[in-house]
Amino acid sequence: LDSEVVTCFDNSIAGSFERFTTTRDAVLISNNAVKGLSAIKLQYGLLNDLPVSTVGNKPVTWYIYVRKNGEYVEQIDSYYTQGRTFETFKPRSTMEEDFLSMDTTLFIQKYGLEDYGFEHVVFGDVSKTTIGGMHLLISQVRLAKMGLFSVQEFMNNSDSTLKSCCITYADDPSSKNVCTYMDILLDDFVTIIKSLDLNVVSKVVDVIVDCKAWKWMLWCENSHIKTFYPQLQSAEWNPGYSMPTLYKIQRMCLERCNLYNYGAQVKLPDGITTNVVKYTQLCQYLNTTTLCVPHKMRVLHLGAAGASGVAPGSTVLRRWLPDDAILVDNDLRDYVSDADFSVTGDCTSLYIEDKFDLLVSDLYDGSTKSIDGENTSKDGFFTYINGFIKEKLSLGGSVAIKITEFSWNKDLYELIQRFEYWTVFCTSVNTSSSEGFLIGINYLGPYCDKAIVDGNIMHANYIFWRNSTIMALSHNSVLDTPKFKCRCNNALIVNLKEKELNEMVIGLLRKGKLLIRNNGKLLNFGNHFVNTP
């Protein structure tokens, strides 16, 4: 067999164990223990995709043995998740049955859990807007049966140890709360917390679950547990992926974009659309940059209209921006918007008299994909965007402009390199398409002293990055919103002439501390007023 092949053997078939012992990389599944070898021991199985813990009157026990590189793998002591879901959950011990049926106080007294914060950690605190505790599946099952909320799982990988779900309160259908949890047997969880050192204020604890160390955060007060929860795994909660510097300095030839997950869809919680997630993740990324956010920030949003005659992107931007920010949006189609000013019509005829601090563009021309021949730079609305950046974007301002494999512009790639920082950002919810946002932070214009790479080469570098990088498809970050709001960083607005731009001023531009534009009233949108504060 190929050395990279892992062979699975069933010990109930004669001769399987002997073949397992001579195979380089293999797994042996047995319902009997093999003397002298350490195993992963599971006390449940799956029958027609449903978890079962007994067959007839006999308990189900599986022993799993592993060989790697011709050697037996010694298994560490571990707790194991139970493979249940919210819909298929059934208690597997007397303690779990008591948890679902007994009063909270009586249960805690019966099992001696007074010092372990069970009221918060396991029973769950739903008295506040943000859900507290409930980090075991059985916690959600108990409260959902009481009619307090509904639960919707949203992790794609069903075999994940740490899962997440979206919880909606029954008395507030518009609410969305995220809850991370594991399906550990309650008896095992009690063993875990009773083994903790409570003489600390805070501590990161490694808990071995499914043969892997998971970090849990422990907080105590007066030798009592206040909270104990699994830390989020950053990769699954990443709002997206930014193009690394290494790919920006390549000199690739343009190839077709060939994504491994092209066209795949991610299941979204009820009431949340892809555009809402996309814009939320874009805003979350912009929060990590040196974006200038002055008082009365000016923002222009192009391509605002969605398929339903509304502007979901503007709604997200309005929620993200400081309350005193001025949001202007535009689209070719009629639409309803949360922007302060909306202009309907072709963006190329949109006359801008004043300078803006942030440009967000979701413009896309579907006809670019059907053009025969080579995939070359497109003009169209990109000509307007390039002119806007050169003439109407504040020095120190920023942009986020959508591109795709076929919808791109050579001059825009070269212009974006005149920002202090630039990248291409792909939102996690849209990694199954070639779409990305060209991000430019802190515009320097003619004061940029960096070498400019040809735009055709840079687009080829982008496609090469997309083809060579596996990106997880996820919307998880949209539910992690405590720090979503964009906060004013008191960036200064000054109106300076070219001869007044010395090294100190340019240094402030680079650091996102300064914007250069007029600071008077925003003009020429009076005929398109939509919302009154």
From Swiss-Prot:
Biological process GO terms, please?
A: methylation; viral translational frameshifting
Underlying gene: rep
Which sites are catalytic? 120, 135, 176, 278, 362, 402, 435
Q: Which GO terms describe its molecular function?
A: endonuclease activity; mRNA (nucleoside-2'-O-)-methyltransferase activity; RNA nuclease activity
Q: What is its EC number?
A: 3.1.-.-, 2.1.1.-
Residue ranges of every copy of the NendoU domain listed in the record: 90-230
Superkingdom of this entry's organism?
Viruses
Where is the site labelled Cleavage? Answer: 233-234
| Pfam families named among the record's database cross-references | CoV_Methyltr_2, CoV_NSP15_C, CoV_NSP15_M
Q: Report the protein name in the record.
A: Replicase polyprotein 1ab
Which key words tag this protein in UniProt? Endonuclease, Hydrolase, Methyltransferase, Nuclease, Transferase
The family database entries (Gene3D superfamilies) matched by this protein are listed as: 3.40.50.11580, Vaccinia Virus protein VP39 (3.40.50.150)
In this chain the Nidovirus-type SAM-dependent 2'-O-MTase domain maps to: 234-530
Per the entry, what this protein does is: The replicase polyprotein of coronaviruses is a multifunctional protein: it contains the activities necessary for the transcription of negative stranded RNA, leader RNA, subgenomic mRNAs and progeny virion RNA as well as proteinases responsible for the cleavage of the polyprotein into functional products.
Residue ranges of domain AV-Nsp11N/CoV-Nsp15M in the record: 1-73
